[in-house]
């Protein structure tokens, strides 16, 4: 296992480091893309900004503050997902079931019956929803929490756009026994862009031109800054077949992919800033 905080490059040009894929490497690809545009003397009709977020994993507080003091961008992307361009993200919600310690028997029964024995798709709660664009509902991040004299259990949903979060909440409440409470700790509604609109079609065409691969827009089970920042779609950096790399030991990204990302992003910047998609 390579040290996470000191990049190591092997003889094949593969770089190992925490964040090389998610997202420090792709951020540098965006910077080099903008630098290349400047060095080539390409004129842009619109200004370009790169925002460095630091709170994407724990609540988006950075962008919430940004949006209080600045206007959102006209359009853009976050390099925090995969290729081709992602036109829709699932919703994300986290729930907490709680009760007094003396109700631990009822609490344990609920957790065992509806959460721990679930197949990961919400079937025990009657939430095994599926649609053609997003696929199946997913349940994850199950954990016991200490609430200072009360029992608590958190669990999260990654849900398709065909179900609303208030429907999820009503369904959970219908399963509760006396003495149990449930609350939605946070929710981020699904993100949905017109896959035939200018932004998605421009990024689709750019990806296809640079890579020669199919750029048909896709959906994702993940969540990115697109949840909170208007007019932003997930776009890169992972290429088809590259899965389960980020947040794991030996996170990696090939030097050639960093360069390829920079090429994709450079052409994308020029086309979006100048209102071109061809």
Roles of regions detected by a PLM:
Residues 116-131, 139-140, 179, 188-236:
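Active-site-adjacent substrate-binding region
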Residues 56-170:
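Midchain, well-structured core segments that form catalytic/ion-binding scaffolds
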Residues 206-207, 211-275:
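Zn-dependent metallopeptidase/amidohydrolase metal-coordination segment
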Residues 174-180, 272:
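A common structural junction motif
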Residues 27-37, 66, 229, 265-269:
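Buried hydrophobic packing segments
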Residues 48-60, 80-83, 209, 239:
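Acidic, glycine-rich active-site loops and adjacent beta-strand->loop/helix elements
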Residues 1-47, 52, 248-251, 255-260:
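Active-site metal-coordination/substrate-binding segment of hydrolases
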């Amino acid at each position: 296992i390579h040290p996470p905080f000191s990049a190591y490059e092997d003889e094949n040009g593969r770089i190992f480091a925490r964040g090389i894929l998610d997202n420090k490497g792709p951020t540098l690809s965006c910077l080099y893309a903008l630098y290349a545009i400047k060095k080539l003397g390409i004129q842009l009709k619109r200004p370009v900004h790169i925002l460095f977020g630091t709170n994407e994993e724990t609540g988006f507080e950075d962008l919430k503050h940004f949006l209080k003091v600045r206007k959102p961008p006209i359009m853009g992307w976050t390099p925090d997902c995969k290729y081709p361009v992602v036109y829709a993200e699932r919703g994300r919600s986290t729930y907490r079931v709680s009760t007094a310690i003396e109700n631990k028997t009822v609490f344990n029964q609920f957790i065992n019956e509806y959460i721990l024995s679930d197949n990961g798709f919400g079937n025990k709660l009657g939430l095994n929803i599926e649609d053609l664009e997003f696929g199946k509902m997913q349940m994850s991040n199950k954990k016991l929490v200490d609430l200072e004299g009360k029992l608590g259990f958190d669990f999260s949903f990654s849900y398709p756009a065909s179900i609303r979060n208030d429907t999820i909440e009503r369904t959970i409440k219908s399963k509760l026994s006396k003495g149990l409470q449930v609350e939605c700790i946070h929710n981020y509604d699904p993100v949905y862009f017109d896959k035939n609109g200018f932004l998605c079609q421009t990024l689709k065409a750019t990806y296809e031109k640079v890579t020669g691969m199919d750029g048909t827009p896709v959906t994702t089970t993940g969540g990115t800054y697109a949840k909170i920042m208007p007019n932003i779609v997930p776009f890169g950096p992972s290429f088809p077949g590259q899965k389960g790399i980020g947040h794991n030991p030996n996170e990696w990204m090939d030097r050639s992919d960093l360069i390829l990302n920079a090429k994709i992003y450079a052409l994308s910047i020029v086309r979006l800033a100048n209102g071109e998609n061809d």
